[in-house]
């Protein structure tokens, strides 16, 4: 084999840095606002961060740009390799649940990138949230690479690398106010059109219900009583509905008591059901919930939401026709 052929036969290696440019910041902004949701990807493969040697650590990431960028930005001044799996542009935690951040893809990516020819060691550092999708035993059996799970948050990696031991605090998955605030734009975009229509036609109650479910709920999440997201949503929705119900009851003192009570009841039925449904959507955005728990919650509470919403709508129409 000639030197030229050997050159082209080397494992493919992409270069990256730990800093962001304007294009990266724009990508982050668009991703947060759900613009081109399928387009926030990096090419799967092996990346060199800084000037790694064959003894440098190997980290594993999803090919969702926010996941990849969170990892590389946390590795300032740490020469290393990043093995990017093809998770179809989905973050680590969600991809682990769907199976794309999984054993087969990890094994395949090790083989395709010929990682064993790039590094002298046989250690991989995976994100903790990727653990549900990967069998470390199976990966070692098929590739001879040992799987090691790093801390829950990429920002703790520099400290973790000193001992390769995660403290209890590093293992704890947090869902801080800032984490919750970053979820609001993408949730808000999905309801922007109905929200605008409701405001234009003057239906302030349902509009408030949507804002409560998409904006207030993630902010107030830790302080709303109960464990289930649905019941939290019902509680928040009832609190939002109460002023509307009181205003409806007091609006026309000359009307019959049953009419005023019915109008108040409309708000107490519609708003909590809408807010609870939107709150339930947040179960997919936090590690506080499990797949089985979410399924139980859906079966338990979605029928209640539907009945409340239907009853509120029917009552609203009925009052109009009776009057």
Where are each of the predicted segments found?
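Non-transmembrane, extramembrane segments of multi-pass ion/lipid transporters
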Residues: 163-180, 287-296
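Generic detector of multi-pass transmembrane helix bundles and their immediately adjacent loops
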Residues: 218, 234-323
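Cytosolic juxtamembrane amphipathic/interface segments immediately preceding
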Residues: 41-46, 170-187
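Core alpha-helical transmembrane segments of integral membrane proteins
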Residues: 181-253
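Extended, hydrophilic extramembrane loops/domains of integral membrane proteins
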Residues: 139-172
